[in-house]
Amino acid sequence: LEVVTLEDHSVPLVTIELAVRNGSFTEPPELNGLSHLYEHMFFKANRAIANAEQYLQKIGQLGIAYNATTREEVVHYYFTTTSPNLRTAMNFMRDASRHPLFDKGEFEPERQVVIGEIDRNESNPYYYLNLEMTNRLYYKYPSRKNPLGNRQTVSAATTDMMRLIQSRYYVPNNSALIVTGDVQFEEIFKMAQELFADWPRRDRDPF
């Protein structure tokens, strides 16, 4: 796991980001959009938190801002919080990245959310124009330039496919942990060692 940290003590805030070499460029056509769907499942139930409702409640109590983005070659997640909550946010990142449950009761509604996102984008003429241009420019593998995904593959997705993505890409030698803000270098590297040292390495998928 590559760990990057940047100190800035001007305000008592920290941001923790996990960047994973994943995204549409890593997907075969039959999995197009599943990196995006996986991103939507990241802030759900895991080993430490029973369900998404409890997850959001805990985050809200601590005033943690969070978000995620799926691009062609990277999926990244972040938490921003006050510096006293650093360890708690690091624990959240560890449990979400390493121990997701992929609860089927949470998976189906989230799959519908992603399908709705695809439908909304495809109803936009500018998105459709860009999609058609991509299909012609990258005619052999156009799906690799479409991180949003397509309706057919997302509709057919299962929790087993989420596990497949996790096993291929969510490994320490395919990820980077970036921590910035009101932190100390030594503290971050020590904490990363404590929380992520036993994360099993795997052979990276050759895409």
Question: Residues of each region from the PLM?
Answer:
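Mature N-terminal segment immediately following signal peptide/propeptide cleavage
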Residues: L1-E17
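M16/MPP (pitrilysin/insulinase) zinc-metallopeptidase core fold and M16-derived inactive scaffolds
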Residues: T15-T80, S123, R144-L148
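Solvent-exposed, polar/charged alpha-helical surfaces in well-ordered, non-transmembrane soluble domains
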Residues: N32, E53, Q57, R87, ...
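M16/insulysin-pitrilysin zinc metalloprotease superfamily fold
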Residues: K44-A48, T80-R111
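Short acidic/His-enriched helical or mixed secondary-structure segments at domain edges of catalytic enzymes
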Residues: G60, V113-E132
